[in-house]
């Protein structure tokens, strides 16, 4: 949750003069998104989300994110759509930060996704990959295989504070992944952070996918691996193969996996588990003062990694081969 | 800002079955209120605020707060109005906490109130006092003169960590206030926390007064003293007598102050300054882990107290005598 920057009523009124949204009717800082400050903004024309981009988001990537949302929305995907300024731009400045207004999506995220929800998620992910296939923009994954050792190095000496033996576990896993990472898989735009709190449901249908600020070009099947870890484990930590099978099955019905992709899932899932374990570990040691953020427990993802290390065959994760 | 308790989609759906509000369309935790968890709740019938009452609010006082809001709304005051359950009650339970739904008020709070805003605030406060005059409920002020020494005692030994000499300043002020606190002033329901972030404006008019969870029976003029401190000092710390005069003038045009009330304002303002300085100091030393709260700087209110200690006559604060 996050509101890092306060917005004054005077600054907001001045900012809105760049838009055709009428005057402000309400503004509430919301507990959504970890990297940016987000507000529900109500104006004379409707309800929107106002985002102020904080330092952790590279400003150079903002046009990529915003034009990706435009592209996906134009293809009928339920994602936030950037609202144009009178100047036709989508990116302004407010309270000293880059800022944008996007449409508000109805829906509530699922705290405990069901097997059917995992199927819906799989289909939505395939739709996202297909809708983005002809998107011209490009952004490298700043949190890929090459980045993980660099994330780990500055905190390696403290990792065992969180759990004895953690530093050795991470070093060994990094070596395994460097040696075994799959090459030449189909690439494209991935969401890269499609956790349950970024998927909105209305009744039994997915009404929206949000928070594209990790989107990048990478292996499409790596996005599935991220979702496998985020959606298909039970709260107690057990993997649920029915959820995996539902997700992979629904995805593959729209975008079939190649044999190489299917085979690579266990390794990709180990990488995805390590990636979130590492960034959570970094956050754990680096909660900025006054950030109003509860760092997520990194051990959840180390436990998932430990389970994934026991998997010999993608079918054990629900992949249909 | 605060969201202490997460609400699952399943628990929320079950909770809404007690209401005639239709199904949920969106739920966003918001950065509003320090004591409770607040959400903007959108349903098929409209937009509301959902509040989960956390431990710091005495559960026994919740019926008082909710019936006060009913009373004020019935008299035309723009305040949140509790939404009735099918059972006619206004107080339910959600995620293990007492919980209520109230109407959503449009408007944006003023970060830097103008002189005219201070006049509007004065009039709104008088309207609140008058509208509450025939309210039957009663609640003692848990943070009154008698409570301040008890707030201070457990943190007295640490006060000088915040500023050298602070403990002695507080002790001397407590003695002064015990000896000089005005008696027999007109009493009634006071808001007791009417800071700028609890007053919503649409354009140049006040569109709503919110957050009644400190409301109680006390000296009506003490409510004015709280507002004087919260509204009539500039960001740099200087007192603005024009703002004081605007506030007192607009208030008195609806509810004239007695001579005793007018004369008491400087002492009441010292008490009000000490009350907020003390609770901020307590919070400063007691930020609960994971509370997602930025404690407010207690020194702001000690600086106001210091200025108020130099005031010999209520007219120096803008009171018309």
Swiss-Prot record, chains A, B:
GO terms for molecular function: ATP binding; homoserine kinase activity. GO terms for biological process: threonine biosynthetic process. It holds the Pfam family APH. NCBIfam families: PRK05231.1, thrB_alt. The keyword Amino-acid biosynthesis applies. Belongs to the pseudomonas-type ThrB family. This is Homoserine kinase. The gene is thrB. PANTHER family: AMINOGLYCOSIDE PHOSPHOTRANSFERASE DOMAIN-CONTAINING PROTEIN, AMINOGLYCOSIDE PHOSPHOTRANSFERASE DOMAIN-CONTAINING PROTEIN-RELATED.
């Amino acid at each position: 949750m996050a509101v890092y920057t306060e917005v004054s009523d005077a600054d907001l009124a001045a900012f809105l003069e760049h838009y055709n949204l009428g005057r402000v009717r309400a503004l509430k800082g919301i507990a959504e998104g970890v990297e940016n400050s987000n507000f529900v903004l109500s104006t004379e024309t409707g309800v929107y989300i106002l985002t102020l981009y904080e330092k952790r988001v590279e400003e150079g990537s903002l046009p990529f994110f915003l034009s990706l949302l435009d592209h996906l929305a134009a293809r009928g995907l339920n994602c936030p759509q950037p609202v144009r300024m009178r100047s036709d731009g989508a990116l302004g400045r407010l309270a000293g930060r880059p800022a944008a207004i996007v449409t508000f999506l109805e829906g509530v995220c699922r705290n405990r996704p069901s097997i059917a929800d995992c199927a819906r998620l799989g289909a939505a992910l395939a739709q996202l990959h297909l809708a983005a296939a002809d998107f011209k923009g490009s952004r490298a994954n700043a949190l890929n295989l090459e980045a993980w050792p660099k994330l780990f190095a500055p905190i390696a000496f403290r990792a065992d504070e969180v759990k004895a033996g953690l530093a050795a576990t991470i070093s060994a896993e990094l070596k395994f992944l460097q040696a075994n990472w799959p090459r030449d898989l189909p690439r494209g735009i991935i969401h890269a952070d499609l956790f349950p709190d970024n998927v909105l449901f209305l009744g039994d249908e997915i009404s929206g996918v949000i928070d594209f600020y990790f989107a990048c070009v990478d292996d499409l099947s790596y996005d599935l691996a991220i979702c496998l870890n985020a959606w298909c484990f039970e709260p107690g930590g057990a993997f649920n193969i029915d959820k995996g099978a539902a997700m992979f099955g629904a995805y593959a019905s729209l975008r079939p996996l190649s044999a190489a992709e299917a085979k690579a899932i266990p390794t990709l899932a180990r990488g995805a588990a390590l990636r979130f374990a590492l960034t959570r570990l970094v956050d754990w040691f680096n909660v900025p003062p006054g950030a109003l953020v509860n760092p997520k427990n990194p051990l959840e993802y180390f436990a998932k990694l430990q389970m994934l290390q026991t998997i010999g065959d993608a079918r054990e994760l629900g992949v249909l081969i």
